[in-house]
Amino acid sequence: MKRRIIAALLFFCVISAVYAETDYVKMLKDVDELVTFKGTDLSAEYTIVKRDPDGSSSTTVAAMFRRDSEDKFVVLVLQPVADKGKGYLKQGNNLWLYDPIGKGFTFTSAKERFQNSSFRVSDFTGSNYAGNYKINNVKQEKLGKFSCTVFDLEAITKSVSFPKVKIWVSEDNLVRKLEDYSLSGQLMRTSAFPSYQKVGKRWVPAKIIIQDHLVFRKVGDKVEYERTTVDIKNPSLNKQPDSLYTKEYLERVNTK
C-alpha cells in the first residue's frame, strides 16, 4: 500500500512538471506573438542615441520596414548626414549592408552592432524565444510595479545574437527587462523596456534603454557604462510595396 502511494505521488509530480513546462513554453509563444506581425507589414522611425562612458554621444535616425510573414526587413539610415542612405536588407537568412558611397552590397550578420551602438541589427526583428531557446529555469520575481515570470533561456540555434538570455515577463506577456549573456555566463548587456505602444492587436516598444557591460570606464569607485536609448515613433501597419524589400529599392532611394 505504501509503495502504491509513493508511486502515485511520483506520477503526480512528473505529470505536474510536464504540464508546468508546457504552460511556460506556451507563455513564451504568447510573448513572441504579441510583438510579431505576421498578417501585415510594420514600419516605424527609430531614434538611437548612444552615450559613451566619457560623456560624448551620437544620434542615428532610421526608417524600419518589416514583413514578418516573409522574414524580411529593410532599415534605411536617415541621419547623420554622413551615413544617410546606408541600408540593411534582410531576406530570410540573408542580410546585406548597402554602402551608398561605394554603391555596393556586402553580406553582414544580424549580430553586428547597429551604427556602433549597443543596439544590434537583430533587435529590429520580433522575438522568437520559443523557437530559438530552451527553458533552463523559471521563477517569479517583482520588478518595480510588475509581477514577473523570469525565464533563464539557452539557445538551441547558432543564429541568435546571444547564446543565453534572461527575460522578465509581466502578467500581460510583455518583456520588461532583458539580460544577454555569453556562453560562459558573462553578462553582455542589459535592456529595459519602460513603455510599449499598441499597434493594431500587437505591441511595439516605445522606448528601450540598453546598458553595454563590455564598454565602460572606471572613475574612482564608479563605473560608467555605454548606454544606448532607442525611441520608436510613428509605427504603422500600412502595407508596403513588394519592391521595397529589394536591393533595387536601396539603390533607387539613394539616387533621389
Regions found by a protein language model. Give the residues of each.
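N-terminal, post-signal-peptide region of Sec/Tat-exported proteins
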Residues: 42-74, 78-81
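Gly/Pro-enriched, hydrophobic low-complexity segments
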Residues: 108, 146-247
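Extended lipid/amphipathic-ligand handling interfaces
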Residues: 31, 62-66, 192-198
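Flexible, processing/modification-adjacent segments and terminal tails
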Residues: 21-33, 37-40, 47, 56, ...
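Generic beta-strand structural signal
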Residues: 66-68, 89-91, 98, 169, ...
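Sec/Tat signal peptide C-region and signal peptidase I cleavage site
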Residues: 15-20
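N-terminal secretory signal peptides that target proteins for export/translocation
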Residues: 1-2
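Sec-dependent N-terminal signal peptides
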Residues: 5-14
